[in-house]
Amino acid sequence: MATIKQIQFKRTKVAGSRPTAAQLAEGELAINLKDRTIFTKDDLNQIIDLGFAKGGEVSGDITQIGNYTQTGNYNLTGDATISGKTTTSTLDVGSVSDLRQTNFRPVLSTTTGSNFIISNSGGLIKPITLTVEGTATSSNTILRHSVDTTVAASGFIDSINVSLNPTDGALVTALNGTVNIGSSLKTPKLSVSGAETALGDYSISIGDNDTGFKWNSDGVFSLVTDSNSIYTYSRDRTYSNRPTNFRYTSDFDATTPALAPPGTWLASVETAIDGNAYGDGMSYLGYKDTAGYSFYFRGGGTFNVASKGGFNVDTAAAFAKTVDVSDILTCSSIIKAKGPGQVDVTSAGNIALGGTIQWVPSYMSGSPNRARDTIATAAWGDADQRINVLETSDPHGWWYYIQRAGSGSSSPTGIEGRVNGSWQASDLISDNTLRVAGAFTCTRRNSAGWGDNAGWYAGATPVVANQGNVQEMDPGVGGFYPGFAQYNYNGTGWNQAFVLGLLGQGVQRWRRGVLALRGDGPVDAGQQIARWYFSQEDGSLESEGPLKAPSVQAGQITSFGVNVTNALGSASIAIGDNDTGLRWGGDGIVQIVANNAIVGGWNSTDIFTEAGKHITSNGNLNQWGGGAIYCRDLNVSSDRRIKKDIKAFENPVDILSTIGGYTYLIEKGFNEDGSQAYEESAGLIAQEVEAVLPRLVKISNDGTKDVKRLNYNGITALNTAAINVHTKEINELKKQLKELKDIVKFLTK
């Protein structure tokens, strides 16, 4: 009795497709509608092709009984064996086109030499002597006589063997002994080696096929080794294309360097004919003398060194003649230029000058054609008043000098210096007298005076600057000790003053510095218009008024308010109103406070909100890096009233079949050594979804690179649509299955 498997058909429309043994049950049928073939499986688990139809394939042997008629071409792969005698008036064996790619080899018998080959070029090849009875006619005749060229006996072999190729006209000749050419030898290539030259036309290879002489162009050829051009020779110059090493070797040894004999040289240049015939007039590279190799550069021109790195001499060098430097001579070590009245730099590094140093200023800014005078520094002196003088001047007069005054000088004996003008300096320090011919004179330590009638004050006396007028400042009253005051004096009385001093009471240990602006009257700590106190005890700054600044930098501030008085307590910042801002909530905790209610905050691991508080965003919420979002429920807006152009998915199953589900490792932060860290996860690949549903993929930057992000809400919709299609198909299959069961039940009664 047939089973349901044996009465059903499997179908395909794919050309060339055949079922496998695993796909068919015994006796089950499969139809290829494209190839018009039928298959089944027998009890030996073999697939059987049940018919040829309009074409087909037979897998196995065919035994033909009767005549075989073939219309069309017969293609055979393998050998064709004919048993018995085959009689035919004509046997035409050939190729389907003029381009024959193989030889036809008839096998006449097993006897050696009885077979022959018809080659693809139309020739007949027979392994033994071919005897032609009668006349042999051929458009191309090749006569060949081979000789053993290893036999050296005179007269035994031909003096020349020639092979002529009628296709390309090549003549291959073996020449034994001496070759004499009466006039000239012309050949596009010449190889003095066992292989054809690889240097190109009109070239000569020597030893191997890529070493020798290579013709480049008209009048230009190169000396080549291993296909590398070493020297190139042209009509007016020779080019060295690789490093050139001049050395001396023995007559028959071209590889081992040796020392050249005395009086010889490695390279020379003829320079005697340009008017400078010093010595023998020649220039030498590596002239061998008793000291070794020397180098001579001669000629009527100039020896120029224009290297950006400069001219370097690694060993001690001496100039036996005068060296004239017309421009700039720069030396990073020692220069010795000797001569009377000139420069002498000794081996100890001392420089002796026999005259004046003149400095020519360079143009920096301003008008470029404005005159710039030479600045001179000179050393001189006399034997009595001014023993040694070092002076700087220009054509308009002296600037300054320093000298050792002698016993005949009106100045005190010793070292002194003078400036012919004003002197500006941040500090003037001297263990002796500092004198200025103008308004300032200092004659002892801790004293100062201003003006023609300067008064002198002890160092403990406060310094008072009164717009050019110097007045003694009152010591202060009420425990206030002023140290500095800047007055605005209008000629009729004291007005506003800027005061810096100390404030203390009795023997109080800690005093406070006072920075104040005061009105008219004596210097009293109680009469400041504005004042700031600096505590000696803890370094704090106190102000009786608000501190206004565009920015504040401080090591520690207990609390402060931004445009408001802080009511949040210590370690807090009030912003806008007195109970709204940031407040310290414990070790590592910062609280966000609004109207004295804690809204949220952050600690070392989290940013949090208090219970009952919410985070509301009118834009996107982005989670970067390897973090995750954890929540109990995720509610996404899906109200029909906020949507338009609602359409069902087309072919959701086909779309879903192009998207794979995967497990993988995904980036999650970094390891302690800085390398990328990963964690296990599972999901989809955004690029696969983008290929079929690009609207579900967005690109955003995670701070280091652009990352594609996936709308899984859309994937849920796609899954739902695909499930609906599958549900419909399942219901249809259930209906068909019921019908098949009814048929089977009927057939098996």
UniProtKB/Swiss-Prot annotation:
Disulfide bonds: none annotated. It holds the Pfam family Peptidase_S74. Residues 720-749 form a coiled coil. Its main location: virion. One of its GO terms (cellular component) is virus tail, fiber. Proteolytic cleavage and release of the chaperone in the host cytosol stabilizes the folded protein. The record marks S638, D639 as: Cleavage. PROSITE patterns: ICA. Residues 638-737 form the Peptidase S74 domain. Belongs to the S16-like long tail fiber protein Gp37 family. This is Long tail fiber protein Gp37. It comes from Salmonella phage S16 (Salmonella phage vB_SenM-S16).
